[in-house]
Amino acid sequence: MKFCYNCGTALSGTEKFCGQCGARIEHKPAPPVHGVSPVPSSETSAHVLREQDQEVKARKCSRHGVIFTNISALARKFGTDRKVLERLFEQYADGMASADIDYRLADASDYIFRSKGAGRKSDRVSLGERATWVDYQHILYDIVCLEREKGLPESNYLFIIGGHDIVPVPAINHYINDPELGDDDIETDLLYAYPYGPHTQSALESQQLYKQEMYFLVGRLPVPTDADVSYLANYLQNALDVRGGVPVTKVYSQCDPHWKELTAHLMSPYNELGMLPDRGNISGRFCYGNVLLGPEITSEHIASVMEKDTDLIFLNLHGSDRPSDSGYCGEFPPKTHQYHEIFPTSAMRIPQRYNIFVAEACYGGRFIGYDTLRSMIQSGLAHKTVIGLASSRIAFGMPSPPASSADVICATFVIGLLTGYSAGEAMVLARQSFFGEDGILSDTGATTLAEFNLFGDPSLRAAIALDSSKSARKLSRNIAPKDFPIGYETKVIKSGPTGEQSLLDRVRSAVDANIQAISNAIGKELYAQYGLAPREPQTIKRVKYANGQERLLFSYSEPSDGSAYSVKTLWRVTTSTDGKIESVLTSK
């Protein structure tokens, strides 16, 4: 009789893993791989076994993907043996094969480069704490090159396991260069979708990367600071339970009252299908079009109004980057710029069905350095959320219809899911919607494309179609059409502190004499429609787009006033050069 070398449990002799501790049971040494000497011990890294499996006996699946992590770092974080994690990933890959996706593991803590194109064939690496996202991207580039060199099926899905301390989150320079913004960069996993080298960062910052074909559809399972291995096991089991599709029958939607018309508009397709609970018996103070309103429905009431069988959560509320502000908030009383918690992280534990979570809030998808209770997305993923979409930075949207920026990417993502696309495909569809007939991608639009990240397994789908005639079709892997005129030149007319002379006084001497009148008209509109007291714009810019069109951009800010939550509201007003207001965007 054989015994597990790790825990001593008796074995029958045929097991691949110990049923007690999860340790891999080796019955014979693994054969060498392409001239690379085997590890000089009884262990062989999981990525080598899976790569051999793919070349010799690939699963009969039409979809292929990579589970990407750093097992050594993950094992240290969880305080567990790496073999336990290898077993979890192997079981997950086996289970997901029945959903027509063949996942293989790429472990950055024990990886052998095997392609010619990556330039490091036979190099064995173990990425540590000092490794950057570029080092991790190089591993993905090796996978891409190997698949192309050997004619293997393309692994179009990339499922990242771990937070910034496990697989670094790339950051790019921010597109919006306004001093009042406060953010200098954007954290985005989008660079892992294009594993072609460090130049992809500058290509994304110039927005030209959107014209290139992406290789991976990326989703990430971040790991909270307070998590143990049960967090990972729980999510993987949840995802396996819905591998055939996440049932979506009941929607919970809540918004700040200033955005009620827009949110009700976005939710109207699901309202017509009866997916939003009928709240006709609730006063208009609390509800609009079956969408609950923030100031009246607060964290104290969530448990009594959020149904336990909710399977899609759509929130259009404010978020904060202050570490102590864990939940989402709303303005209360209206037009006072005072913000209070409306939707706490604990609310993510109310639904007892597997669910999809979508949030427009600023910093709604923050997770780096946060525990479960301080991160909304991690709180959901620790419970029943299997797919999530949220932003890493300040997000912008329209106060009222038509939709723009965060409203568009979130609403289109949901439509994509509910018309048969996988989560990763729905993310592509949502980003493609920004390249429309007007031929313009603004700095706000570019920010939205990068800052919204997908959470969870990107291969998962919803189990409902809004309209069978609109079932999922094959998508282009280019976010932007190759002939789309991307780019813009910005001339700052005035910016920053006003000094002794007011900004508007100095604007009077600007080349465009009508800017003073335009600014006055904007001030009246903001006060009449949104209660924003008259003030000077902090920034005025003239923007010339690659298609030849020109716009004026006025930026304003309104700090919170004595709020329990730290929320600075930003306004960005775009006009034609003759002063016609085209859009009014506000931060979420």
Task: Locate each region found by the language model.
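Exposed beta-strand-loop-beta-strand "reactive/processing" segments of non-cytosolic proteins
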Residues: 534-576
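Catalytic-core segments of thiol-dependent peptidases
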Residues: 110, 116, 143-168, 251-370
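Active-site-proximal C-terminal subdomain of hydrolase catalytic domains
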Residues: 112, 165, 360-483
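Preferential activation on post-signal-peptide N-terminal prodomains/segments
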Residues: 474-516, 561, 585
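Structured catalytic cores of large enzymes
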Residues: 43-102, 110-277
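Short, non-transmembrane alpha-helical segments in secretory-pathway proteins
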Residues: 499-545
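Cys/His-rich metal-coordination motifs, chiefly Zn-binding "fingers/knuckles"
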Residues: 1-35
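Catalytic cores of nucleophile-dependent amide-cleaving enzymes
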Residues: 165, 186-234, 316, 321-413
